[in-house]
Amino acid sequence: MTESSFKLAIVVSQFNRAVTEKLLNGVLQRLTELDVQANQIKTVWVPGAVEIPLLAKRLAKSKHYQAIVCLGAVIRGETDHYNYVCQQVSFGCQQVALEYEVPIIFGVLTTTTKEQAFARAGGERGNKGADWADAAVSMIKLMKEIEITDE
Protein backbone atom coordinates (compact mmCIF):
# COMPACT_ATOMS: atom_id res chain seq x y z
CA MET A 1 0.00 0.00 0.00
CA THR A 2 1.73 3.15 -1.15
CA GLU A 3 -0.59 5.83 0.16
CA SER A 4 0.59 7.49 3.35
CA SER A 5 -2.71 9.05 4.34
CA PHE A 6 -3.29 6.73 7.27
CA LYS A 7 -1.77 5.99 10.64
CA LEU A 8 -2.10 2.89 12.71
CA ALA A 9 -1.22 2.03 16.28
CA ILE A 10 0.03 -1.18 17.78
CA VAL A 11 -0.65 -1.97 21.44
CA VAL A 12 1.64 -4.70 22.77
CA SER A 13 1.50 -6.56 26.08
CA GLN A 14 4.79 -6.81 27.97
CA PHE A 15 3.60 -10.00 29.67
CA ASN A 16 4.98 -13.00 27.77
CA ARG A 17 7.27 -10.52 26.02
CA ALA A 18 9.34 -13.27 24.37
CA VAL A 19 6.21 -14.10 22.35
CA THR A 20 4.78 -10.61 21.90
CA GLU A 21 8.07 -9.20 20.57
CA LYS A 22 8.03 -11.85 17.86
CA LEU A 23 4.42 -10.99 17.02
CA LEU A 24 5.33 -7.30 16.86
CA ASN A 25 8.23 -8.09 14.54
CA GLY A 26 5.82 -10.02 12.31
CA VAL A 27 3.47 -7.04 12.14
CA LEU A 28 6.24 -4.54 11.44
CA GLN A 29 7.92 -6.71 8.81
CA ARG A 30 4.66 -7.19 6.94
CA LEU A 31 3.79 -3.50 7.13
CA THR A 32 7.21 -2.70 5.65
CA GLU A 33 6.47 -5.14 2.81
CA LEU A 34 3.21 -3.24 2.25
CA ASP A 35 5.15 0.05 1.99
CA VAL A 36 3.81 1.41 5.26
CA GLN A 37 6.37 3.88 6.60
CA ALA A 38 7.68 4.01 10.17
CA ASN A 39 6.16 7.49 10.67
CA GLN A 40 2.71 5.99 10.06
CA ILE A 41 3.04 3.57 12.98
CA LYS A 42 2.88 4.17 16.72
CA THR A 43 3.80 1.30 19.04
CA VAL A 44 2.77 1.39 22.69
CA TRP A 45 3.62 -1.21 25.35
CA VAL A 46 1.23 -2.03 28.20
CA PRO A 47 1.95 -4.18 31.27
CA GLY A 48 -0.39 -7.06 30.41
CA ALA A 49 -3.21 -8.20 28.17
CA VAL A 50 -5.94 -6.83 30.44
CA GLU A 51 -4.58 -3.31 29.90
CA ILE A 52 -4.83 -3.56 26.11
CA PRO A 53 -8.48 -2.44 25.72
CA LEU A 54 -8.05 0.73 27.79
CA LEU A 55 -5.09 1.93 25.76
CA ALA A 56 -6.81 0.89 22.53
CA LYS A 57 -9.77 3.01 23.60
CA ARG A 58 -7.55 6.01 24.33
CA LEU A 59 -5.89 5.67 20.92
CA ALA A 60 -9.24 5.23 19.14
CA LYS A 61 -10.71 8.21 20.96
CA SER A 62 -7.83 10.40 19.76
CA LYS A 63 -9.02 9.90 16.15
CA HIS A 64 -5.37 9.87 14.99
CA TYR A 65 -5.35 6.20 13.97
CA GLN A 66 -7.34 4.41 11.30
CA ALA A 67 -6.66 0.98 12.82
CA ILE A 68 -5.23 -0.43 16.03
CA VAL A 69 -3.50 -3.80 16.23
CA CYS A 70 -3.61 -5.32 19.71
CA LEU A 71 -0.92 -7.90 20.47
CA GLY A 72 -0.70 -10.22 23.43
CA ALA A 73 -0.10 -13.80 24.49
CA VAL A 74 -2.32 -15.35 27.13
CA ILE A 75 -1.14 -18.84 28.03
CA ARG A 76 -3.24 -21.17 30.15
CA GLY A 77 -1.97 -21.81 33.66
CA GLU A 78 -3.20 -23.84 36.59
CA THR A 79 -5.99 -21.45 37.64
CA ASP A 80 -9.10 -19.92 36.07
CA HIS A 81 -7.24 -16.62 35.56
CA TYR A 82 -6.69 -17.50 31.88
CA ASN A 83 -10.45 -17.63 31.23
CA TYR A 84 -11.08 -14.24 32.81
CA VAL A 85 -8.20 -12.55 31.00
CA CYS A 86 -9.21 -13.96 27.60
CA GLN A 87 -12.81 -12.89 28.08
CA GLN A 88 -11.96 -9.38 29.30
CA VAL A 89 -9.47 -8.65 26.55
CA SER A 90 -11.58 -9.96 23.68
CA PHE A 91 -14.75 -8.25 24.91
CA GLY A 92 -12.91 -5.01 25.66
CA CYS A 93 -11.33 -4.83 22.22
CA GLN A 94 -14.65 -5.50 20.51
CA GLN A 95 -16.35 -2.78 22.56
CA VAL A 96 -13.72 -0.23 21.51
CA ALA A 97 -14.16 -1.12 17.83
CA LEU A 98 -17.92 -0.78 18.01
CA GLU A 99 -17.94 2.39 20.10
CA TYR A 100 -15.36 4.32 18.06
CA GLU A 101 -15.79 2.64 14.66
CA VAL A 102 -12.05 2.04 14.43
CA PRO A 103 -10.85 -1.39 13.36
CA ILE A 104 -9.33 -3.13 16.36
CA ILE A 105 -7.34 -6.11 15.16
CA PHE A 106 -7.41 -8.78 17.86
CA GLY A 107 -3.88 -10.13 17.80
CA VAL A 108 -3.94 -11.80 21.18
CA LEU A 109 -2.84 -15.41 21.13
CA THR A 110 -4.80 -17.56 23.57
CA THR A 111 -2.99 -20.86 23.85
CA THR A 112 -2.75 -23.81 26.17
CA THR A 113 1.06 -23.95 26.12
CA LYS A 114 4.06 -21.71 25.49
CA GLU A 115 5.04 -24.00 22.65
CA GLN A 116 1.75 -23.28 20.89
CA ALA A 117 2.32 -19.55 21.32
CA PHE A 118 5.86 -19.67 19.92
CA ALA A 119 4.66 -21.84 17.02
CA ARG A 120 2.33 -18.97 16.01
CA ALA A 121 4.89 -16.23 16.65
CA GLY A 122 7.39 -17.14 13.96
CA GLY A 123 7.58 -20.89 14.53
CA GLU A 124 6.25 -23.76 12.45
CA ARG A 125 2.78 -22.16 12.22
CA GLY A 126 4.19 -18.91 10.82
CA ASN A 127 3.88 -15.50 12.39
CA LYS A 128 0.30 -14.44 13.01
CA GLY A 129 1.58 -10.87 13.27
CA ALA A 130 1.84 -10.76 9.48
CA ASP A 131 -1.80 -11.84 9.17
CA TRP A 132 -2.88 -9.15 11.60
CA ALA A 133 -0.95 -6.49 9.67
CA ASP A 134 -2.78 -7.59 6.52
CA ALA A 135 -6.09 -7.40 8.37
CA ALA A 136 -5.34 -3.87 9.59
CA VAL A 137 -4.49 -2.56 6.12
CA SER A 138 -7.51 -4.33 4.60
CA MET A 139 -9.83 -2.83 7.19
CA ILE A 140 -8.39 0.65 6.67
CA LYS A 141 -9.15 0.34 2.95
CA LEU A 142 -12.64 -1.02 3.58
CA MET A 143 -13.50 1.70 6.08
CA LYS A 144 -12.42 4.34 3.54
CA GLU A 145 -14.52 2.71 0.82
CA ILE A 146 -17.59 2.61 3.03
CA GLU A 147 -17.36 6.01 4.64
CA ILE A 148 -20.60 7.33 6.04
CA THR A 149 -21.20 11.04 5.84
CA ASP A 150 -23.36 12.84 8.34
CA GLU A 151 -25.99 14.84 6.52
From Swiss-Prot:
Query: What's this protein's name?
Result: 6,7-dimethyl-8-ribityllumazine synthase
Active-site residues annotated for this sequence: H81
Catalytic reactions on record: (2S)-2-hydroxy-3-oxobutyl phosphate + 5-amino-6-(D-ribitylamino)uracil = 6,7-dimethyl-8-(1-D-ribityl)lumazine + phosphate + 2 H2O + H(+)
Entry-linked CDD domains = Lumazine_synthase-I
- Single GO cellular component annotation? cytosol
Q: What is the lineage of its organism?
A: Bacteria, Pseudomonadati, Pseudomonadota, Gammaproteobacteria, Legionellales
The residues the record assigns to binding (2S)-2-hydroxy-3-oxobutyl phosphate are: E78, T79, R120
Pathway, per record: Cofactor biosynthesis; riboflavin biosynthesis; riboflavin from 2-hydroxy-3-oxobutyl phosphate and 5-amino-6-(D-ribitylamino)uracil: step 1/2
Coiled coil location: none
- Assigned protein family: Belongs to the DMRL synthase family.
Domain of life, per the record? Bacteria
Q: Which organism is it from?
A: Coxiella burnetii (strain Dugway 5J108-111)
InterPro entries to which the protein is assigned, alphabetical: LS (IPR034964), LS/RS (IPR002180), LS/RS_sf (IPR036467)
Q: Which gene encodes it?
A: ribH
Quaternary structure, from the entry: Forms an icosahedral capsid composed of 60 subunits, arranged as a dodecamer of pentamers.
